[in-house]
């Protein structure tokens, strides 16, 4: 009808607003798989991880140190674990982990040959920008 128009405002806010209803805009990002090789010095294993992985060694993750440059609301972190390349990723039995702006670290116990990190949110008024995440990783031997 005459006189009716719509105004669309893009790239503002963190929620979807439609017909006065506010809903979350879900977001997620998943890293690629990474694995480790045990460092060898003069032919002897050092039990230290070398991040130039070959998928031969099991790795143990004991801690996640999240780094969000800007975070409002809660964010979910999940470790996706695989022992073989064509295997379906399994989530760590202790996760997923809810991260708040005051979370400094998350203690966990995860073991796998390769691990990917998934970060997501599904709640209203949530936004985040990634920094550099850190994981405490140790070589866990061959299996």
Residues covered by each model-derived region:
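Beta-sheet repeat architectures centered on beta-propellers
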Residues: 1-143
